[in-house]
């Protein structure tokens, strides 16, 4: 039976390892089922040279769920794959898997087996003249850490990018780190698409990654989407066609090719690709959300074609699109309750359906969330403000949420729309009641935000005079 001293000694050694247990992967409990599904999908459908790490991550997820025996099986698969895929680097790459084994056995109370794996790590470190007993600084492990962080969601993307960047500083032509850096950069760019004055930085890394990984269809479709963002759709479509012609990672390629075609306006083609992908990965949150967006696009097409007055068959088609979009958005948020964008799309679609109770439920969930990106919270407050103004007919609540969106000072299109909506609402109130203290003050505030200082001062002064007149009348009494 182990002593407390043994336990502490082993624990001190474990803390020095570089593996999933020491990388501080930020994973919310609500995100665990979706993460596990994405990991399993990647194992089955993504053709990659870097699959050992995904088995290690699956083992870590299984451990977090309390399934330690299943976790050990995943680590054994990782160990077997290591021998097949990385013969010349097996020893270095194995350090992550062995580190995870050591932590697993420690958590299971099997200290002797934990020590066995610690000894394996120490032997390799000695063999490679490493200055640390249990910690190896090398590009291979930097990449493993980067992939793990990248898979665990938006909170980890900056750290993932830094891991791949560290490798590229030493080896700029490294295909693996080039791919990882480009994917990280693309996702971080995606967070900032609605931000004013944001300069995208993922286009060049994606071009470099495609050059170094010419058979990787997944990176090609990301490059295509970024080219589309930059107004270079024709060039982007060439990469889409190349990726679709290659059988590699087709389920993943379909997802992103569909997004490209939806944004191009070819919604039917997008839906065809998404439904093919959904047959292979029916639990994919991303697919359900993308399908919902396609039905939303078709709904908008019907509205525009009928000038917002659909009747007969058009009305039936519109209602069908709304129901279909709701179904897929619901599927997405059920599988990933922290998916803020899908929750917002769902709330807005319930407004289209006239179901204000369900819209309110989803907005209330959103208001309790803490999105990774500030602009997402701006979107939530802006759309909830519009819901309050136009559906609930509450100017008071609408103003509160427009102001909350504006208070988030990140310059964005949504912030501009919030300022404009607040201005329209306040002007409407002033037309009804010219001597309204709050409205005069708010209009002064809006003009200040717009940089119209003369108008701002005029309305602030009118508000102050009105407040002074009111105070004098109260003092004088009836």
Swiss-Prot record:
Gene name for this UniProt entry: IFIT1
**Pfam families given for it?**
TPR_12, TPR_2, TPR_8
What GO biological process terms does the UniProt entry carry, in alphabetical order?
antiviral innate immune response; cellular response to exogenous dsRNA; cellular response to type I interferon; defense response to virus; intracellular transport of viral protein in host cell; negative regulation of protein binding; negative regulation of viral genome replication; negative regulation of viral translation
A GO CC term assigned to this protein in UniProt: cytoplasm
Classify the main location: cytoplasm
Q: What is the lineage of its organism?
A: Eukaryota, Metazoa, Chordata, Craniata, Vertebrata
Where does it localize? Cytoplasm
Subunit structure, interactors included:
Component of an interferon-dependent multiprotein complex, at least composed of IFIT1, IFIT2 and IFIT3. Interacts (via TPR repeats 1-4) with RPL15. Interacts with STING1/MITA; could disrupt STING1 interaction with MAVS or TBK1, acting as a negative-feedback regulator of virus-triggered signaling. Interacts with EIF3E; this could be an alternative way to inhibit translation.
Effect of changing residue 290 to E: reported as: Decreased capped RNA-binding. Loss of capped RNA-binding and decreased translation inhibition of viral RNAs lacking 2'-O-methylation of the 5' cap
Which species is the source of this protein? Answer: Homo sapiens (Human)
SMART domains recorded for this chain? TPR
Ubl conjugation recorded as keyword: yes
| Binding positions for mRNA per the UniProt entry | 147
Name listed for the protein in its UniProt record? Antiviral innate immune response effector IFIT1
Q: Which domain of life is it from?
A: Eukaryota
Which UniProt keywords are listed? Answer: Antiviral defense, Cytoplasm, Host-virus interaction, Immunity, Innate immunity, Phosphoprotein, Repeat, RNA-binding, TPR repeat, Ubl conjugation
């Amino acid at each position: 039976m182990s002593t407390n001293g043994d336990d502490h000694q082993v624990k001190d050694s474990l803390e020095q390892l570089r593996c999933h247990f020491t990388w501080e992967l930020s994973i919310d409990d609500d995100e665990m089922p979706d993460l596990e599904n994405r990991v399993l999908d990647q194992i089955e459908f993504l053709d990659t040279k870097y699959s050992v790490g995904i088995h290690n991550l699956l083992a870590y997820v299984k451990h977090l769920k309390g399934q330690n025996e299943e976790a050990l099986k995943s680590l054994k698969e990782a160990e077997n794959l290591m021998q097949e895929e990385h013969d010349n680097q097996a020893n270095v790459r194995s350090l992550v898997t062995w580190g995870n084994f050591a932590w697993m056995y420690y958590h299971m109370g099997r200290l002797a087996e934990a020590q066995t794996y610690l000894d394996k790590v120490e032997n390799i470190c000695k063999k490679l003249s490493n200055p640390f007993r249990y910690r190896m600084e090398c590009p291979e492990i930097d990449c493993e850490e980067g992939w793990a962080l990248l898979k665990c969601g938006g909170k980890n993307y900056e750290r993932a990018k830094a891991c791949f960047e560290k490798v590229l500083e030493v080896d700029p032509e490294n295909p693996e780190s080039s791919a990882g850096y480009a994917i990280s950069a693309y996702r971080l760019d995606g967070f900032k698409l609605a931000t004013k004055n944001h300069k995208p930085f993922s286009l060049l890394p994606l071009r470099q990654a495609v050059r170094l990984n010419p058979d990787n269809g997944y990176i090609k479709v990301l490059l295509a989407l970024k080219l589309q963002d930059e107004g270079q759709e024709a060039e982007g479509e060439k990469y889409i066609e190349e990726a679709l012609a290659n059988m590699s990672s087709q389920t993943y390629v379909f997802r992103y090719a569909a997004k490209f075609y939806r944004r191009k306006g070819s919604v039917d083609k997008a839906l065809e690709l998404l439904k093919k992908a959904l047959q292979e990965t029916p639990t994919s949150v991303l697919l359900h959300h993308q399908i919902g967006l396609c039905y939303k696009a078709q709904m908008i097409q019907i509205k525009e074609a009928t000038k917002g007055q659909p009747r007969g068959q058009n009305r039936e088609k519109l209602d069908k699109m709304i129901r279909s979009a709701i179904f897929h958005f619901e599927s997405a948020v059920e599988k990933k309750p922290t998916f803020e964008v899908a929750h917002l799309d769902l709330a807005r679609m319930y407004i289209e359906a006239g179901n204000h109770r369900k819209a309110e439920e989803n907005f209330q969930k959103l208001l309790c969330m803490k999105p990774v990106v500030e602009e997402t919270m701006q979107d939530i407050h802006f759309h909830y403000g519009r819901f309050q103004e136009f559906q609930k007919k509450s100017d008071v609540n609408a103003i509160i949420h427009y102001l909350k969106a504006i208070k988030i000072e990140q310059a964005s299109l949504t912030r501009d729309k919030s300022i404009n909506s607040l201005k329209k609402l306040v002007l409407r109130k002033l037309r009804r009641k010219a001597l309204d203290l709050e409205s005069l003050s708010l209009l002064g505030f809006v003009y200040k935000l717009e940089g119209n200082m003369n108008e701002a001062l005029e309305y602030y002064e009118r508000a102050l005079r009105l407040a002074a007149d009111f105070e004098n009348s109260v003092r004088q009494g009836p």
